[in-house]
Amino acid sequence: MINILFVAGGTGGHVIPALNMADYISERAPHWKISFIGRKNSFEEKLIAGKYDFYGLDIIKSSDIKKLSYYLSIKDALKILGELEPDILVVFGSYITVPIIVASIIKKLPFFLHEQNVIPGRVTKLFYRFSQGVAVSFPETREYFKDKDKIYLTGNFVRTELLTMDKASCKKELGFDENRKLLLITGGSQGSMKINYEVKKIIPYLLNNGWQILHQIGEKNYVSYIEGIPIEEWAKEGYNPVPFIKNMELAICGADFAISRAGATTIAQFLIAGLPAIYIPYPYAKDNHQIYNAEVVVKVGGGELLLENQLNSEKLITLLDKWDNKDRLAKASEACRKISIANGRENFWNLILEKLEGRN
């Protein structure tokens, strides 16, 4: 029996691919033991606990790296690894994972890193030489590493089952009219107050122009967002604001166009589904990595880049009117699919098997 440990936390961009990969392995090797490490009382614990064994570390911040609390987290990580004795770890890099990586190096445990973004994060760049290899989502990412022999283009770990479903069927399952166009709006797993604020101003305009709208608000922002809007009236015309979209694959499958952040996992899903979008990168992302993610799509004609400091309701209307064209959407959809990597989980699964066989 192989004991595999996933390390992920922070945002859906790290946690969702980890969970997707774990599910893929579970289906193909049900005898393998699969566990997760993340932060206590966190987003990832809520998402994972009950499905897989979850081990929580005390929450630490990137600013704590030079503080005692970080070294205590390494001590806790060493204890957990000693108890679990994993054969291999899969790490989805962020500052949260550093104590586990350090503990793995100390205990000489093999680990893979997965880099979702075009621009590799600091954790990936710092520790990749100690790893079995880095699985990357974009071919452009290889250029940021000196030791390219450790870099493997697998693609992101995206569920593909629903992304190949019929668009009309997906709309129907989501509760929308299958004969009308559907706009998906998401500010990421946490939502975006800025995107929500500007979108709210143009909902009547969009509805009058035939759009149905599925809008992920974010759980923290939902109550304040819906206050004062004619929610029942707008709902009758096809507007559905929700705190969190539980089945994002279904939403992506049913959508004709999107307004979205430019997280790597979101982009991977959009590309596979052939979903063009207006990308509004999160402005506080390290090294502006969401801008680089979006540019990969924009340069092939698969969407539009709109910086948050340029975002306003008038600009959104201009861009949405530009993209409200069947021929333009069809060409963009095809461009997205051409650069997509649909078999990321299979590629990484084969890589794990190869490394494990080479160990024996």
UniProtKB/Swiss-Prot annotation:
Pathway the protein takes part in: Cell wall biogenesis; peptidoglycan biosynthesis
GO process annotations (BP): carbohydrate metabolic process; cell division; cell wall organization; lipid glycosylation; peptidoglycan biosynthetic process; regulation of cell shape
E.C. number(s) listed in UniProt: 2.4.1.227
Any one GO molecular function term: glycosyltransferase activity
Cellular component annotations (GO), alphabetically ordered: plasma membrane
Bilayer disposition of the protein: Peripheral membrane protein
Tree of life domain: Bacteria
Keyword terms: Cell cycle, Cell division, Cell inner membrane, Cell membrane, Cell shape, Cell wall biogenesis/degradation, Glycosyltransferase, Membrane, Peptidoglycan synthesis, Transferase
UniProt main location, coarse: membrane
Binding annotation for UDP-N-acetyl-alpha-D-glucosamine: 11-13, 117, 159, 189, 245, 290
The keyword DNA damage belongs to this UniProt entry's keyword annotation: no
Entry's localization field: Cell inner membrane
CDD domains hit by this protein: GT28_MurG
Pfam families xref list: Glyco_tran_28_C, Glyco_transf_28
Catalytic activity: di-trans,octa-cis-undecaprenyl diphospho-N-acetyl-alpha-D-muramoyl-L-alanyl-D-glutamyl-meso-2,6-diaminopimeloyl-D-alanyl-D-alanine + UDP-N-acetyl-alpha-D-glucosamine = di-trans,octa-cis-undecaprenyl diphospho-[N-acetyl-alpha-D-glucosaminyl-(1->4)]-N-acetyl-alpha-D-muramoyl-L-alanyl-D-glutamyl-meso-2,6-diaminopimeloyl-D-alanyl-D-alanine + UDP + H(+)
SUPFAM superfamilies per the UniProt record, alphabetical: UDP-Glycosyltransferase/glycogen phosphorylase
Job description of the protein: Cell wall formation. Catalyzes the transfer of a GlcNAc subunit on undecaprenyl-pyrophosphoryl-MurNAc-pentapeptide (lipid intermediate I) to form undecaprenyl-pyrophosphoryl-MurNAc-(pentapeptide)GlcNAc (lipid intermediate II).
Family: Belongs to the glycosyltransferase 28 family. MurG subfamily.
UniProt xrefs under HAMAP family: MurG
Classification via PANTHER family: GLYCOSYLTRANSFERASE, UDP-N-ACETYLGLUCOSAMINE--N-ACETYLMURAMYL-(PENTAPEPTIDE) PYROPHOSPHORYL-UNDECAPRENOL N-ACETYLGLUCOSAMINE TRANSFERASE 1
Protein's recorded name: UDP-N-acetylglucosamine--N-acetylmuramyl-(pentapeptide) pyrophosphoryl-undecaprenol N-acetylglucosamine transferase
Species the sequence originates in: Dictyoglomus turgidum (strain DSM 6724 / Z-1310)
Gene field: murG
